[in-house]
Regions:
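Membrane-embedded and interfacial regions of multi-pass energy-transducing membrane proteins
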Residues: 1-93, 97-410
Length: 410
């Protein structure tokens, strides 16, 4: 067996890659529970890919057959109901773990030098994940799927000069139709998963090149023993692979509880209107995107005044796009001499809490019908969201920091 392994490794460096990225990749020994979510996102990605493949086998990507094929999967395909619930719940779980993964990066400065590229790859994954979720949202061909996609695609029409042509190009028709469904199906099932997997590989390669951050924001490569091994590092395998099994068990317990007992999640994962087939002549009472898009939808609706002769709808789209785009430049906005929130001053801590609260409340506001009071609150929270980033070069520089230890703490 060893000869076979050596023969393969001489031609395809499997063992070398395993050692570099697992058994001889030294990670900081003080990881806490916030570092579970990267591994959990990989687990959910595998779930989405596998369940997606099996669902595709019975799905009919046509306006005439899409809704009926979903009902067929739910009623007649053996364990089809389980596959669908695993996939729909997995989509929400994916965004839960990704948002927590991103928040951990914000807390511990995982975007700062030398991990700028790791952060950019991660944000690109987030962007592709949003596109993947949006494309997949149309596929059930229910009322909310149809009208939600209609609203989002029509937003591109607010762009001056090219807006209408861009909307037409995305739809492939003058209205959302079977043509739109077919191209969204192709993108959701083939194109975007390939891009997503490639970005995940790049994200991990970039991470393992510069090394993992830790709750203290200390570079463990600066303290090595006589063998060149970081004193505060432990091999990722077997220590953190076993460590992550605990998180996987807890996660699967909660995940399966949702799948088997609350798969609709009160209408947040599977909306009530989506149990009706798409009807272009009947508009739902309230159109809202899936919960993981609602913070940006709330920002879009918060803009109620046109500027420079351009309508409020256009500026809402600009604000929504800027809310995502500004995350990409975060590594160059933070001027703090320390990485971790543990050693930053009160201004940075209050700012991060205000940012997190504003994002969560915006998520709620985007999911409910708009009222004048809620619109005003959304405007205030949108201001707080952007202030966190725009003012960061100033408050991160003047904030009083604590001394950072030379080695990691417990």
């Amino acid at each position: 067996m060893q000869k076979l392994i050596d023969w393969v490794d001489a031609r395809l460096p499997v063992v070398t890659a395993y050692e570099k990225h697992m058994s001889k990749y030294y990670a900081p020994k003080n990881f806490n529970f916030m570092y579970f979510f990267g591994s959990l996102s990989m687990l959910v990605l595998v779930n989405q890919l596998l369940t997606g493949i099996w669902l595709t086998m019975s799905y009919n990507p046509s306006a005439e057959g899409a809704f009926a094929s979903i009902e067929y999967i739910m009623r007649d395909v053996e364990y089809g109901w389980l596959l669908r619930y695993l996939h729909s719940t997995g989509a929400s779980a994916f965004f839960v773990v990704v948002y927590l993964h991103m928040f951990r990066g914000l807390m511990y400065g995982s975007y700062q030098k030398p991990r700028e590229l790791v952060w950019i790859f991660g944000m690109t994954i987030y962007l592709v994940l949003m596109a993947e979720a949006f494309m997949g949202y149309l596929l059930p061909w229910g009322q909310m799927s149809y009208w939600g996609a209609q609203v989002i695609i029509n937003l591109f029409g607010a762009i001056p000069v090219v807006g209408e042509d861009l909307s037409l190009w995305i739809r492939g028709d003058y209205l959302i139709s079977g043509v739109t469904l077919n191209r969204f199906f192709a993108l959701h099932v083939v194109a975007l998963p390939i891009v997503l997997l490639a970005l995940v590989v790049l994200h991990l390669l970039a991470l393992h090149e510069v090394g993992s951050n830790n709750p203290d924001g200390v570079d463990i490569k600066k303290n090595k023993d006589e063998n060149g091994i970081p004193k505060d590092g432990i091999p990722f395998h077997p220590y953190y692979t076993v460590h992550d099994i605990v998180a996987v068990v807890v996660f699967l317990f909660v995940f399966c509880a949702v799948v088997f007992f609350f798969p609709e999640m009160g209408g947040y994962a599977l909306e009530k209107p989506n149990f009706e087939p798409a009807n272009p002549l009947k508009t739902p009472e309230h159109i809202a995107p899936v919960w993981y898009f609602t913070p940006y939808y709330a920002m879009l609706r918060a803009v109620t005044v046109g500027i420079l002769g351009l309508p409020a709808k256009f500026w809402g789209v600009v604000v929504m796009g800027a809310a995502i785009a500004i995350l990409f430049v975060l590594p160059w906005l933070d001027r703090s001499p320390v990485k971790s929130i543990r050693y930053k001053g009160w201004i940075s801590k209050v700012s991060l809490i205000a940012f997190a609260v504003s994002f969560v409340v915006l998520g709620y506001l985007g999911a409910v019908p708009s009222t004048p009071g809620k619109t005003t609150l959304a405007q205030i929270l949108t201001f707080i969201y952007f202030a966190f980033f725009i003012l960061m070069p100033w408050y991160s520089r003047i904030d009083k920091t604590k001394p950072v230890p030379e080695r990691v703490t417990g």
